[in-house]
């Protein structure tokens, strides 16, 4: 049902890449621009993610991003992280586009 422009996909993937790079480098500050200030992670404040990534430090992991759907100003992506400190994860991120561009509003994840 996507009606997005190529620019939307590029901006969505950029937000995802900021998150992935922050995970890989163990740098919560690096991923902050990808997230809305009121974003949540599994229902908790997003600062939990930033603090956890920084505390964990760099990780030798691989990631894949799939844009599942984009409709007007909302999108859903799936991020698969392999070997993030020895575990594999699947995330779903809900994004919303506003005057500041595409921002992740919510992140849910599970270990697989």
Question: Where do the language-model regions lie?
Answer:
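Short, low-complexity N-terminal intrinsically disordered segments enriched in polar/charged residues
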Residues: 1-29, 33-37
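Short beta-strand segments enriched in hydrophobic/aromatic residues
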Residues: 35, 81-83, 108-109
């Amino acid at each position: 049902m996507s009606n997005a422009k190529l620019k939307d996909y590029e901006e969505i993937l950029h937000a995802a890449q900021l998150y992935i790079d922050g995970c890989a480098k163990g740098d919560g500050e690096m991923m902050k621009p990808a997230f809305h200030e009121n974003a949540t992670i599994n229902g908790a404040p997003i600062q939990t993610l930033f603090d956890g990534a920084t505390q964990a430090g760099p990780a030798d992991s691989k990631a894949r991003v799939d844009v599942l759907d984009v409709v007007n100003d909302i999108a859903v992506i799936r991020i698969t992280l392999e070997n993030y400190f020895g575990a594999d994860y699947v995330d779903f991120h809900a994004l919303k586009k506003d005057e500041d561009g595409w921002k992740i509003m919510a992140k849910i994840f599970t270990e697989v």
